[in-house]
Amino acid sequence: MALKGQEDYIYLFKDSTHPVDFLDAFRTFYLDGLFTDITLQCPSGIIFHCHRAVLAACSNYFKAMFTADMKEKFKNKIKLSGIHHDILEGLVNYAYTSQIEITKRNVQSLLEAADLLQFLSVKKACERFLVRHLDIDNCIGMHSFAEFHVCPELEKESRRILCSKFKEVWQQEEFLEISLEKFLFILSRKNLSVWKEEAIIEPVIKWTAHDVENRIECLYNLLSYINIDIDPVYLKTALGLQRSCLLTENKIRSLIYNALNPMHKEISQRSTATMYIIGGYYWHPLSEVHIWDPLTNVWIQGAEIPDYTRESYGVTCLGPNIYVTGGYRTDNIEALDTVWIYNSESDEWTEGLPMLNARYYHCAVTLGGCVYALGGYRKGAPAEEAEFYDPLKEKWIPIANMIKGVGNATACVLHDVIYVIGGHCGYRGSCTYDKVQSYNSDINEWSLITSSPHPEYGLCSVPFENKLYLVGGQTTITECYDPEQNEWREIAPMMERRMECGAVIMNGCIYVTGGYSYSKGTYLQSIEKYDPDLNKWEIVGNLPSAMRSHGCVCVYNV
């Protein structure tokens, strides 16, 4: 019997547990073999009894197979070639649970199968896994793999590492096995990070000598491709005369350099990287993002930091993304755990997952596809806690505490080891720490490796050519540390004293930006460049405004 006056009353009931219950029910049907109507068979003979509707809902491959006019549409058993039973079992379980375990051991086979069977979400998850584990020793193979399976993010990020770290990449075993076509592709990249003649000739020599009988014919083609100004008649004649001899690396090198025209030009500078200046401080917190190309000396402005009231944060770069972590607001000097992420390709900010520990004046670096936050201040005292953010798992994970908590220290990464140098320590940061702390992520362990010759805070450090360079601070002293020899050496002094400056490596040189000069009592706007070949500093430009405590990172163009 209808309620009077409420004929139009509607209650829309939505059961939020229904999708989960529905999937759980089908999972039970699958395990119990109920209502199954299709059997999948691996090459090994192992079979899986499934439901057509479930497979079609997860895979466009099966949807087309079961709906289009194909012979498989009417079959009760489908034989799938080229897929290991463990991989197929994982994909079938994913269809019934929405979960699948991806490991270093199975990821490539899983992506191949997901690509073939069009489990698009699984393929994307595998792609993100491979991006997370990209490094100099696998980026060439991953680039070819990405091209073959049409993985755009993996292709781009493997190319970013390949081009930005080419000097390290060509010294890997993987490089020696690449095809001529792949080598020509690499050499044709306009953003290949090479700035010296030998940096482009040496990999050609190395690759040719690895299989000299089959590759010597490619030598002239390779040299022509990279626009090295050689005498073609001399080189071809010399190669012809040497054909019967065993050509070693040294002989090939001698042939090439003898074939160079006496008046040849050095290779032209390439625009391989862009400097990003994030925020900073000039009598008050700055929120601007400034972008600089050192070759054109042109500045453009990016989207401002959304949280414009904070300062003394950590800034680091992972691929195209710039992470801004922690800091404090000037009105209460309370440490923040907030994270903002700037995408340099889209010029957009998004809020990231908060850190486990609030901190400011801490160190931020990237290692192994993750973002690390180390030490810093909390409640006015230096903290020992350290953590890293895994962008694939989307979570912050604590690591071993530092040996000594430090604030306003500097950190950088060399050969997969994190080095933290200097900073304040002790009660309320009353002392300056003179030790260098190193962190090995493989064993989750910190060590003390050496002492800094002039312990300071507010320094910057950068890795270059297997060494660490220490710049800035209250003096113009610049020092270089060789971890292999455990030796420090002093290099040419800077032109300015730069407390809390920024520093990056670009085009084979060190660029140091801004800072505060205690001797002059002023904020600095200038940019200094150090050329290690000349052991010389020079002023090469200016920031858009004077500043200190700013983020300064390099993003490689792809």
UniProtKB/Swiss-Prot annotation:
Coiled-coil stretches: none
Q: Which GO terms describe its cellular component?
A: Cul3-RING ubiquitin ligase complex; cytoplasm
Per UniProt, residues of the BTB domain are 36-104
Among PROSITE patterns, the record links this protein to: BTB
What residues does the BACK domain cover?
Answer: 139-240
MF term (GO), any:
ubiquitin-like ligase-substrate adaptor activity
The GO annotation for biological process reads: proteasome-mediated ubiquitin-dependent protein catabolic process
Any matching Pfam family:
BTB
Keywords of this entry: Kelch repeat, Repeat
Which CDD domains does the record associate with it? BACK_KLHL23 (cd18462), BTB_POZ_KLHL23 (cd18252)
* Swiss-Prot/TrEMBL Kelch repeat ranges: 274-320, 321-369, 370-416, 418-466, 467-508, 510-557
- Name this polypeptide is given: Kelch-like protein 23
Source organism phylogeny: Eukaryota, Metazoa, Chordata, Craniata, Vertebrata
